[in-house]
Amino acid sequence: LAPYIYDELQDLPYRQVGVVLGTAKYYRTGVINQYYRYRIQGALNAYNSGKVNYLLLSGDNALQSYNEPMTMRRDLIKGGVDPADIVLDYAGFRTLDSIVRTRKVFDTNDFIIITQRFHCERALFIALHMGIQAQCYAVPSPKDMWSVRLREFGARFGALADLYIFKREPRFLGPLIPIPAQQHDVPDDAQSYP
């Protein structure tokens, strides 16, 4: 998976769509979640540098009081992203849902995933298994979050079970909602793959 993961923005290839994987903005203690902060900053960097034209914000919206896509949208607009370049996926309950829905609902088969490196590995594993072309922009991770890394260990086993044993699909699919392509010029090197 290493050839598909980019740690440096300047090395990241252009793709029309960047998919920001959701997480809570705050911990239960009320402290800002650094994973969230780094993902938002990574999305702003990719967008502002012209590496992506649209940001698909995929996250959990299970409760009226908890809405990851809308929270990300507000912060990205505050950061200067044009609201017309933001698409919301309210059914990104888990990584498998976010990746597969990007292909099957938002009609995008070649995109940049924006998340931390450890999460990139699982997201790309799912994408490649499903025949989806994706690359990942690996944003920084907080250094002292052992509980998240422990959770990731379990999530990887869950992903293997979902793909190979249960053959799970996203919880919700729905009608096709293509992300617009006509508003932006596509650079000449848009089809370069690692």
Question: Which residue stretches match the model-derived regions?
Answer:
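A structural signal for short, hydrophobic/glycine-enriched beta-strand patches
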Residues: 1-150
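N-terminal membrane-anchoring alpha-helices
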Residues: 1-15, 171-178, 182, 187-193
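Low-complexity, compositionally biased segments
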Residues: 10, 78, 100, 155, ...
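A transmembrane-helix-recognition feature enriched in membrane-embedded lipid enzymes
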Residues: 146-172
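A general structural signal for short secondary-structure boundary/capping elements
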Residues: 62-67, 135, 158-164, 181-186
